[in-house]
């Protein structure tokens, strides 16, 4: 079945599984980058505790770079799928080309931050000179060679928009395998490679990302033949860029808010470096679980957007129904794994003094996965139906408006010795439950105003 016919005619429940599985695997493998680095770094012979703390502090900026690439890609994905659904091949070529132009701009910004801003950023979160040195070294490498992750994110969405998510997964697998192979070689110094510690972890990560980006570039040029390619389509078009970011900006802000949340949580937990490290390690496990929801969201968005472009009320309704059902099933599985095996994850990271805090965080925060996953699915539905504002509001509630004041207030009781650190972790389930209720109200409004009115 041709890709465009598949998006139009295949039953939505089957289409979502066919598109969703590769995307879920791709997102899970993306989370593996961070977990693998931390696992190998946690088992360094010298300085592993400081190194884990350093990786916790650099993580928000890594997330921010991914946010810029993925957010631009999300806007491109939905707009490209809708444009192809309308049969406008010329505009589709401009959408794809302008997304690559935006990728160049994003890389230049990351490069400049890597050269001039890294030290000030790390020093704002720690006074430990060893942690500062490791954090600066790691983050500078990731920023200067960030073109790999940025363009991988863009090519991934371009392939997903045309129903070729399997190929984006192949690229992700190749990059992950490269990273896993290089990590022990470059961190510990195996064979002719010198021991580089956290620098080795950074180099292994960016080399894997570049490998993925190059492979997806080849797939994009060879397989995405529904629209034209070439430098002429990269010429900036203000109208196209505006449309991309009308959809994608909320996704960028949502991802950026995750970075801000982790950064502020690091500041809140600064009084207890072990709890700070534990939170950073848990967040990587949490990302692994929630990236399952993100991967399914990336199937939900183009399926519903394509149906919206062709004004198919039935396929939109099916996309919403099955998207939520499959998301709930994945999140229940994630909760079961993290609640049953917290000790195994702690052992993987060799978390030392942070072990007790890590297990405590996992026991409490994993309860929120069900509601967090539903919120992610809601946002994918909103984005497909031009609900950028609603998506942004949910992100603000989840990552800023509720979570940070609540965690800050709870931390006062912890610092005064009235309660344990676990009180801070309860801010997460409370936030997700409130946001989920608001998200349901938004979904009812969008269905009434944009779906029920279709013929």
Regions found by a protein language model. Name each.
Residues 73, 142-160, 168-176, 201-216, ...:
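Short runs within selected transmembrane alpha-helices of multi-pass transporters and secretion channels
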Residues 18-37, 141, 175, 208-212, ...:
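Transmembrane helical elements of multi-pass membrane transporters/channels
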Residues 49-60, 135, 139, 273-288, ...:
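Small-residue hotspots at the loop-to-helix junctions and early N-terminal turns
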Residues 23, 27, 39, 78, ...:
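Transmembrane alpha-helix boundary and packing residues in multipass membrane permease domains
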Residues 7-39, 43-47, 60-75, 79, ...:
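N-terminal transmembrane alpha-helices
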Residues 52-112, 149-168, 278-342, 372-386, ...:
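Small-residue-rich hydrophobic transmembrane alpha-helices
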């Amino acid at each position: 079945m041709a890709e465009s016919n598949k998006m139009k005619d295949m039953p939505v429940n089957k289409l979502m599984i066919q598109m969703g599985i590769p995307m879920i695997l791709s997102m899970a493998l993306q989370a593996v980058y961070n977990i693998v680095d931390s696992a190998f770094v946690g088992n360094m012979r010298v300085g592993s505790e400081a190194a884990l703390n350093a990786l916790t502090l650099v993580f928000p900026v890594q997330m921010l770079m991914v946010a810029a690439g993925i957010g631009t890609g999300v806007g491109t994905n939905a707009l490209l799928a809708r444009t192809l659904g309308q049969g406008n091949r010329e505009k589709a070529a401009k959408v794809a080309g302008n997304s690559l132009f935006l990728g160049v701009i994003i890389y230049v910004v990351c490069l400049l931050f890597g050269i001039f801003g890294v030290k000030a950023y790390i020093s704002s979160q720690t006074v430990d000179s060893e942690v500062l040195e490791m954090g600066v070294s790691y983050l500078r490498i990731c920023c200067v060679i960030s073109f790999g992750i940025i363009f991988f994110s863009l090519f991934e969405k371009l392939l997903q928009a045309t129903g070729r998510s399997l190929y984006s997964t192949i690229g992700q697998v190749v990059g992950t395998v490269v990273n896993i192979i290089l990590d022990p070689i470059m961190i510990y110094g195996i064979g002719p490679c010198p021991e580089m510690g956290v620098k080795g972890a950074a180099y292994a990560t960016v080399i894997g990302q570049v490998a993925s980006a190059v492979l997806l570039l080849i797939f994009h040029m060879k397989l995405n033949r529904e629209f034209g390619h070439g430098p002429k389509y990269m010429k900036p078009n203000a109208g196209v860029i505006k449309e991309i970011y009308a959809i994608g900006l909320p996704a960028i802000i949502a991802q950026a808010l995750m970075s801000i949340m982790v950064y502020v949580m690091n500041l809140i937990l600064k009084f207890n470096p072990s709890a700070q490290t534990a939170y950073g390690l848990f967040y990587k496990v949490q990302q692994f679980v929630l990236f399952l929801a993100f991967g399914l969201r990336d199937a939900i968005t183009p399926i519903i957007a394509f149906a919206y472009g062709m004004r198919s009320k039935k396929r939109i309704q099916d996309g919403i129904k099955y998207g939520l059902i499959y998301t709930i099933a994945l999140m229940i599985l994630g909760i079961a794994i993290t609640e049953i095996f917290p000790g195994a994850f702690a052992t993987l990271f060799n978390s030392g003094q942070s072990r007790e805090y890590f297990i405590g965080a996992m026991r409490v925060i994993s309860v929120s996965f069900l509601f967090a996953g539903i919120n992610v699915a809601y946002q994918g539905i909103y984005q497909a139906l031009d609900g950028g504002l609603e998506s942004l509001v949910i992100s603000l509630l989840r990552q800023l408006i509720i979570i940070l004041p609540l965690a800050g207030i709870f931390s006062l009781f912890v610092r005064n010795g009235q309660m344990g650190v676990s009180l801070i972790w309860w801010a997460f389930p409370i936030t997700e439950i409130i946001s989920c209720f608001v998200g349901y109200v938004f979904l009812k409004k969008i269905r009434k105003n944009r779906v029920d009115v279709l013929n």
